[in-house]
C-alpha cells in the first residue's frame, strides 16, 4: 500500500513580494502567488556541498523520503530551480517531496553555479539587444562559451547523477528531470544534449527559443534521441523578449520539436479538466504531453510534479541498451471521450478527438440590444454558429429542409459518444427567428437563426447546452464542449485551431 501523504500546516506570508523569501527556511512559513505556491520546508531536505566538476564547489539538496527502501532499485528525479532561485526554493515550490513520500523515490535539487542563473545556450546578440526590455533587478544571462556539453552546469549535473547512483540504489533506467522557468529551459537543454541518461523530462514555463531547436533547414538539433516529454504552459505567461517570436509560435515549435523526435504523427488526445488543458501525443518512439493551465501566471502549479509523475514518469523507463519503454502509468491519461470544438472561420470541427468537415465555416453572430439607445447598439452576446446540416452529422440526427433551406428540421435524439437526449423527437428552425419548435413547443435560442451562403445556421453553444447538457467554453474564437466542467485555455485554443485550419 502507498504511504499516505500529509500536508504540514504553515502560516501564509501574504505580505511577501520576493521571488524566494528566506523566511521559508524557518519550516513554518508558506507563500502563495498566481505563479508559484509553496509548502512548508520539508524536514528531510538536506544540503550538500562538494566539487563535482571544474574544481568548482557546487551546492545541491537531497530529499530521501522515509519510504525509501535501499534494498530495491529506486527512481531518481532531478528538479531544476528557476532563475534567481535555489535548489531548496524549488523543493518548497513543488510537490516533488510529497510525491516522493508516497512513491519512495529520491529527489535532488541542484543549485545553479553562479548568480542563481543556469548556463544556457542562447542567441547572445539578441540578449544584448534586448537589455533595455529587461527589469533592472534581473541579472544578465551567462554568455555561452564552447559547446553545451562543456557548460559547467551541464557537466556538474551529469556528475551529480553519477554521485546519486553511487550513494543510493538508483534505477539507471528510471532517471527523470523536471524544471521550472529557467530550470525548464535548462531541462530542455539537458534533454537535447545529454538526454540519453534520462527516461523522461518535464518543465513548466519558459519554453525553448525555436532557433535552438531547429537548424536553417528546419531539421531538429538533437544529440540524445527520444525520451518522454511533458510541457507545462501557463495561459498568462510570456516568452522571454530576446526570443523575438510570439508566445503561440514558440509553444508550437516546442511541441513540433519533440513530436518529431518521438515520432508523434497522429492527432493528440485532448482532455480538459476545469482549468487544466491537456493534449496527449503518443509516438512510435516516445510520448509528448502539453498541459496549459488557464488563468495562471509564470511559474508552476504546485501539483505539477504530481501530474507529471502520475501521467508520464511513472509509466516510462529505459532498458540497459537505452531504449525507451512504456508501462501503465499511475493514472490513465485524462482524455475526453466526448468532445467537440469549432473555430472562427474554420471549416473543420474537432469531434471526439478526430476531425470532420463542416458544410460551411464557423462564424460568430452577435446578439444586440438597440431599443432606447438613440440609434446605438450594445452587444449582449457573441456565439459560434455552424450549419444545421453539420449539427445533424455531429449529433447523428436526420435533416429535413423546406423553402430552399430557410426552414430546417432535426429529427431523432441527438447523440455524441455515449450521451444521448432521449427527450428530443424533432426540432424546427426558421431563418430570422430566435424561436425554435422542440417537440411541438416554442423555445427561444440565444439568438436568431441565420442564413449564411445558403445554409441555415444556429448557435452551437446553445444546442450543446440545451440538448446534451454539455459544458461549453470559449477562448480566442475557439469553442470547446465536453461532458464535464471545463474551461478552454489560450494555448489549447491555438493548438486546436491549427488542426482545424
Enumerate the language-model features and the residues they cover.
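Primarily recognizes the serine-hydrolase "nucleophile elbow" in alpha/beta-hydrolase
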Residues: 165-225
Amino acid at each position: 500500500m502507498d504511504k499516505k501523504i500529509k500536508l504540514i500546516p504553515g502560516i501564509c506570508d501574504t505580505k511577501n513580494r520576493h521571488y524566494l523569501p528566506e523566511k521559508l527556511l524557518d519550516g513554518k512559513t508558506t507563500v502563495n502567488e498566481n505563479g508559484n505556491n509553496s509548502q512548508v520546508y520539508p524536514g528531510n531536505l538536506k544540503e550538500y556541498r562538494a566539487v563535482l566538476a571544474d574544481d568548482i564547489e557546487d551546492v545541491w539538496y537531497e530529499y530521501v523520503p522515509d519510504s525509501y527502501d535501499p534494498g530495491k532499485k529506486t527512481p531518481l528525479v532531478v528538479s531544476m530551480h528557476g532563475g534567481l532561485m535555489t535548489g531548496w526554493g524549488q523543493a518548497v515550490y513543488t510537490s516533488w517531496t510529497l510525491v516522493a513520500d508516497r512513491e519512495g523515490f529520491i529527489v535532488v535539487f541542484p543549485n545553479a553555479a553562479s548568480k542563481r542563473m543556469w548556463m544556457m545556450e542562447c542567441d547572445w546578440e539578441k540578449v544584448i539587444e534586448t537589455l533595455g526590455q529587461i527589469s533592472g533587478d534581473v541579472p544578465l544571462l551567462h554568455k555561452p562559451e564552447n559547446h553545451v556539453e562543456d557548460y559547467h552546469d551541464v557537466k556538474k549535473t551529469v556528475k551529480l547523477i553519477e554521485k546519486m547512483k553511487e550513494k543510493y540504489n538508483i534505477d539507471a533506467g528510471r532517471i527523470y528531470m523536471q524544471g521550472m522557468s529557467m530550470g525548464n529551459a535548462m531541462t530542455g537543454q539537458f534533454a537535447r544534449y545529454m538526454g540519453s541518461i534520462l527516461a523522461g523530462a518535464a518543465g513548466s514555463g519558459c519554453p525553448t527559443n525555436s532557433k535552438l531547436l531547429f537548424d536553417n533547414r528546419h531539421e531538429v538539433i538533437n544529440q540524445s534521441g527520444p525520451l518522454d516529454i511533458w510541457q507545462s504552459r501557463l495561459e498568462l505567461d510570456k516568452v522571454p523578449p530576446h526570443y523575438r517570436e510570439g508566445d503561440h509560435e514558440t509553444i508550437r515549435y516546442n511541441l513540433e520539436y519533440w513530436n518529431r523526435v518521438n515520432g508523434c504523427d497522429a492527432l493528440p488526445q485532448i482532455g480538459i479538466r476545469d482549468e487544466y488543458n491537456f493534449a496527449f501525443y503518443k509516438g512510435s518512439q516516445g510520448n509528448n504531453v502539453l498541459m496549459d493551465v488557464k488563468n495562471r501566471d509564470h511559474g508552476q502549479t504546485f501539483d505539477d510534479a504530481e501530474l507529471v509523475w502520475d501521467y508520464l514518469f511513472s509509466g516510462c523507463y529505459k532498458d540497459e541498451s537505452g531504449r525507451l519503454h512504456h508501462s501503465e502509468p499511475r493514472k490513465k491519461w485524462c482524455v475526453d471521450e466526448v468532445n467537440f470544438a469549432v473555430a472562427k472561420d474554420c471549416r473543420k470541427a474537432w469531434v471526439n478527438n478526430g476531425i470532420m468537415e463542416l458544410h460551411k465555416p464557423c462564424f460568430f453572430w452577435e446578439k444586440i440590444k438597440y431599443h432606447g439607445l438613440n440609434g446605438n447598439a450594445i452587444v449582449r452576446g457573441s456565439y459560434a454558429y455552424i450549419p444545421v446540416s453539420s449539427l445533424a452529422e455531429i449529433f447523428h440526427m436526420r435533416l429535413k429542409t423546406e423553402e430552399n433551406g430557410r426552414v430546417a428540421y432535426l429529427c431523432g435524439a441527438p447523440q455524441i459518444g455515449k450521451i444521448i437526449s432521449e427527450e428530443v423527437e424533432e426540432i424546427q428552425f426558421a431563418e430570422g427567428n430566435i424561436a425554435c419548435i422542440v417537440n411541438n413547443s416554442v423555445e427561444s435560442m440565444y439568438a436568431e437563426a441565420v442564413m449564411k451562403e445558403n445554409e441555415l445556421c444556429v448557435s452551437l453553444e446553445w444546442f450543446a447546452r440545451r440538448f446534451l447538457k454539455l459544458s461549453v467554453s470559449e477562448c480566442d474564437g475557439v469553442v470547446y464542449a465536453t461532458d464535464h466542467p471545463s474551461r478552454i485555455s489560450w494555448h489549447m485554443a491555438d493548438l486546436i485551431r491549427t488542426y482545424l485550419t
